[in-house]
Design a protein with these regions (language model features):
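Beta-strand-rich solenoidal segments
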Residues: 1-224
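Charged, amphipathic alpha-helical segments
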Residues: 88-102, 261-277
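Short amphipathic beta-strand/extended segments with alternating polar/hydrophobic composition
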Residues: 88-91, 127-129, 227-230, 297-306
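A general secondary-structure signal for short beta-strands and their flanking turns/coil
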Residues: 111-113, 153, 213, 259-263, ...
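Short, acidic/charged, Gly/Pro-enriched secondary-structure junctions
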Residues: 114-119, 269-302
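Beta-strand secondary-structure signal
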Residues: 115, 157, 263-267, 287, ...
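Solvent-exposed edge beta-strands and adjacent loop segments
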Residues: 215-267, 303-318
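Short beta-strand and beta-hairpin "edge-sheet" elements
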Residues: 289-334
């Protein structure tokens, strides 16, 4: 049992901006994590989670020059922070239209799929699959779409069923999102800035070399904390349940419950109640760290907007209760 003698409450007094970094697949291809956490959400330092993928444009069409086996790709934008020419702050890259991109036909068996991609240099490139006697939907299999390099984005596919050179038909071009094309916003995801992770609504397809998912990157700012003292009575933002019931005929009762998100709060003794540094942080979405013992590893993180209720009692130091309105519960960390 710990006596709360050396506890501290700290607030996000500043931020340290980080460059884009790759997030790690937790194993099920739905949750991706970043070792750097928690993430600031205050104005000017908002975090950006950027899965690789097409944002706008990129329509593939039979080559206007009508060359055999060739396609054109309309200009497009994509999110790919590690790609040559991408913005260092947003991860967005603009790629010019490409013409006469050659898809590959089989030499013996007619069924062959070519992926039309943009590679890590921002260049539109065709990646050929292996020919077969029939199409397959298995990546890397004979007759299937190829595994494309890590750091590339799939724009679409060209599917040939004949070895005879010919002008590409529009029916041989496929760009269904999630099957033949990678979009940055599919599948959708939720973000947990305190834990430093994102969760996708479904598993990311394993279409890249090594049977891995597309890259997911994040640009975040980490907090620089300042201690608030003297402080006491820290209350985390916990979730609570409340039960209710309704009475029906024949002594029947139907119960129900609701879940609500609580606020965090703590009390603080102020210097003059006017010029204290923490007062300037009210109304901002900040990270708050509570340590039960400043000499030990465990801590708790809360993220939310602070508000203050001050009391100025004659003959005493001004005091205040700071309440933190949150969007998610406080999170406990062992280290």
């Amino acid at each position: 049992m710990t006596a709360l003698i050396n506890s501290t409450v700290e607030y996000e007094a500043g931020q340290s901006q980080q460059a884009f970094a790759a997030m790690t697949d937790a194993g099920a291809h739905t949750i991706f994590t970043l070792a750097t956490k928690p993430w600031s959400a205050t104005t000017g330092f908002e975090y950006a989670v950027v899965p690789y993928g097409i944002a706008t444009g990129g329509v593939i069409s039979p080559a206007a020059a009508a060359g055999n086996n060739n396609v054109d790709v309309a200009a497009f934008t994509a999110y790919a922070p590690g790609m040559t020419g991408a913005s260092a702050t947003t991860g967005l890259i603009s790629v010019s239209a490409a013409t006469n991109i050659a898809a590959t036909r089989g030499t013996t068996n007619g069924y062959r799929i070519t992926s039309i991609t943009v590679d890590s240099t921002g260049t539109v490139v065709a990646v050929s699959g292996t020919e077969s006697t029939a199409f397959s939907e298995t990546r890397g299999a004979a007759g299937g779409p190829p595994l494309i390099p890590v750091g590339s984005i799939e724009i679409g596919q060209v599917r040939f069923s004949s070895i005879t050179a010919a002008v590409v038909a529009s029916t041989e071009i496929y760009q269904v999102v999630g099957t033949h094309q990678e979009r940055y916003d599919y599948p959708v995801w939720s973000e947990d800035p305190i834990r430093g992770q994102v969760t996708f609504s479904s598993a990311l397809p394993l279409i890249h070399t090594g049977s891995v998912a597309k890259k997911v990157m994040a640009r975040v700012a980490t907090p620089i904390y300042a201690v608030i003292e003297p402080a006491r009575n820290w209350k985390p933002a916990d979730v609570s349940n409340s039960a209710s019931s309704e009475q029906y005929y024949n002594h029947k009762t139907v119960g129900s419950f609701t879940t609500s998100q609580g606020q965090a709060s703590f009390d603080v003794s102020l210097n003059d109640g006017v010029s204290d540094a923490v007062l300037a942080k009210m109304g901002l979405n900040l990270l708050w760290r509570y340590k039960p013992d400043l000499y030990r590893a465990p801590y708790q993180i809360t993220q939310g907007v602070g508000s203050i209720a001050r009391t100025n009692t004659a003959g005493a130091s001004p005091t205040a209760t700071i309440t933190i309105s949150v969007q998610q519960p406080s999170v406990d960390f062992a280290s």
